[in-house]
Amino acid sequence: MSELRLMAVHAHPDDESSKGAATLARYADEGHRVLVVTLTGGERGEILNPAMDLPDVHGRIAEIRRDEMTKAAEILGVEHTWLGFVDSGLPKGDLPPPLPDDCFARVPLEVSTEALVRVVREFRPHVMTTYDENGGYPHPDHIRCHQVSVAAYEAAGDFCRFPDAGEPWTVSKLYYVHGFLRERMQMLQDEFARHGQRGPFEQWLAYWDPDHDFLTSRVTTRVECSKYFSQRDDALRAHATQIDPNAEFFAAPLAWQERLWPTEEFELARSRIPARPPETELFAGIEP
């Protein structure tokens, strides 16, 4: 099999396991090289698993999250690298406080773009994935991740940009991952009802107007990867500080998910080769 290379760019450790993880596991299993690039260490992330909300964990959160990322990458079968920036945290309140001076979201765009361009030129991916302009949700690091990823995609092949950052490499395609679609959540919620159970997604669905499911309309590419859903879930559980094993994410049985929604969804944002959506592969149209 000819080797193709996929780079998934994420803001924090755990994002790679909740957004497109089964697709990464599938391509790695098929013999392609898959690299996850994590832009920050997640140092300012909250502890979302009550069992991990302990003084010792708080005191070692950066170290623990690095270990969690190592485990998740091993489970998915992917390569991994850190870009080395510091988590910005998620400001809260009607008048949220300013972001910390040392955080990723405040690093000049040229600086963070050059750092990612170095990785792109070294790994030489055919395809990159990242978040859309809204970051998937409005965390400052997710929005910055989008900006940096798009900038690196555009700059990596330009020999005039960042001439000291390695030999230029042109990435063929850039995708946005769309992991949380209302249609999917509604389908699983309805399946709970058919089994006489109260589904866990009622409150989430209440916030979304079913007549304005704009993310679904942006999807161009659906990758069949149901065989790897269990790996996806195991990788997410490896991020024990960030996910409660009893959380809604794991509520729907895998058998339901595999039958009702066996794909992960992406939006082809930029392409330097002819593209004919709808697609079923991120590497569609690419020859190594």
UniProtKB/Swiss-Prot annotation:
> Which cofactor does the UniProt annotation name?
Zn(2+)
Per UniProt, the enzyme's principal EC class comes to: hydrolase
The record's free-text note on cofactor binding: Binds 1 Zn(2+) ion per subunit.
Cite the EC number.
3.5.1.115
Q: Which GO terms describe its biological process?
A: mycothiol biosynthetic process; mycothiol metabolic process; mycothiol-dependent detoxification; symbiont-mediated perturbation of host innate immune response
The free-text biotechnology note states:
MSH is a glutathione analog and is essential for this organism. As MSH does not exist in its host (human) enzymes that are required for its metabolism (such as this one) are potential therapeutic targets.
Matches recorded under SUPFAM superfamilies: LmbE-like
Record-annotated residues binding Zn(2+)?
A: 12, 15, 142
In terms of Pfam families, this protein maps to: PIG-L
Q: Which InterPro entries does the record cross-reference, listed alphabetically?
A: GlcNAc_PI_deacetylase-related, LmbE-like_dom_sf, Mca
Assigned GO CC terms = cytosol; plasma membrane
Q: Which reaction does it catalyse?
A: mycothiol S-conjugate + H2O = an N-acetyl-L-cysteine-S-conjugate + 1D-myo-inositol 2-amino-2-deoxy-alpha-D-glucopyranoside
Q: How is its activity regulated?
A: Partially inhibited by MSH when MSmB is used as substrate. Competitively inhibited by the GlcNAc-cyclohexyl derivative 5-(4-chlorophenyl)-N-((2R,3R,4R,5S,6R)-2-(cyclohexylthio)-tetrahydro-4,5-dihydroxy-6-(hydroxymethyl)-2H-pyran-3-yl)furan-2-carboxamide, which also inhibits MshB.
- Which keywords describe this protein according to UniProt? Hydrolase, Metal-binding, Zinc
Q: Could you cite one Gene Ontology molecular function of this protein? A: zinc ion binding
Please describe what this protein does. Answer: A mycothiol (MSH, N-acetyl-cysteinyl-glucosaminyl-inositol) S-conjugate amidase, it recycles conjugated MSH to the N-acetyl cysteine conjugate and the MSH precursor. Involved in MSH-dependent detoxification of a number of alkylating agents and antibiotics. Activity is specific for the mycothiol moiety. Has a low but measurable deacetylation activity on GlcNAc-Ins (N-acetyl-glucosaminyl-inositol), and thus can also directly contribute to the production of MSH.
Q: HAMAP family annotated for this entry?
A: Mca
- What's this protein's family per the entry? Belongs to the MshB deacetylase family. Mca subfamily.
Assembly behavior:
Monomer.
* Name of the protein described by the UniProt record: Mycothiol S-conjugate amidase
Native species of this protein? Mycobacterium tuberculosis (strain ATCC 25618 / H37Rv)
Q: Which gene encodes it?
A: mca
